[in-house]
Amino acid sequence: MENQEVVNQLAGFEVKVSGQPLSKLPEDLYIPPDALRVFLEAFEGPLDLLLYLIKKHNIDILDIPIAEITRQYMQFVDLMREMRIELAAEYLVMAAMLAEIKSRLLLPRPVVEEENEQDPRAELVRRLQEYERYKKAAYDLDQLPRVGRDTFIADAAVPPMNTAKIHPTAELPELLNALKDVLQRASLYNAHSIAREPLSIRERMSRILSLVDKENFIAFTRLFTVEEGRMGVVVTLIATLELIRQSVIELVQAEPFALIHIRAKG
């Protein structure tokens, strides 16, 4: 009887002994009740088990035969119990869910409710599809190169090098000649430092007023000179703004984007 159970469990699997296919167990084969069993499949949860059963039998995930899947699922649960393997509570919860879906599909339903009622398998299909996406993403991440598994950091110590230091030999006359040559080359480069004349904002204000008094109406650009550089631009601009603040001069413009002029205010 126990041998027959083993045969039933091997149904659907191709078993070979010494390279030859085995369709049935020898008649004189005795398998003790507590014989060693090797279970090769490992699942991360009930959804993983269901996905395995669906792929194993090439079942369309959108059209799951609940009765057949429930039967195979319960066979796995019973097998785990026979092998005294502790099952997580989530496996039993999934078994109850499958039984509920199976009963809802078998019970007759009114025509009105049948048109509006959602397929009892819809929630299970959604969870399976979502789990399959996460499982594929985890597999893709696992295939990425990983330090310590696929690549290893080289940790090779540099062998000690015992090399003798060779000190250069130089005589005093040679050093004096080298120093003389350096001094001669240094004398060829004479540096000249040129100090700029400091610019005064007060003086620039007086200069602007003098120009305005002479011509009464001058272009703003005439206040600046190229020779004074950026410092001259800054000083002239500050002086102009200070005179405008004191209401001594004003800026005028005939039209937008036209040339700006300065004239005395009043």
Swiss-Prot record:
One GO cellular component, as annotated: cytoplasm
Keywords: Cell cycle, Cell division, Chromosome partition, Cytoplasm
Signal sequence region: none
Single biological process term from Gene Ontology: cell division
Entry keyword annotation includes Cell inner membrane: no
Superkingdom of origin organism: Bacteria
Record localization: Cytoplasm
Protein family according to the UniProt entry: Belongs to the ScpA family.
Self-association and partners: Component of a cohesin-like complex composed of ScpA, ScpB and the Smc homodimer, in which ScpA and ScpB bind to the head domain of Smc. The presence of the three proteins is required for the association of the complex with DNA.
Primary role: Participates in chromosomal partition during cell division. May act via the formation of a condensin-like complex containing Smc and ScpB that pull DNA away from mid-cell into both cell halves.
Protein name, per record: Segregation and condensation protein A
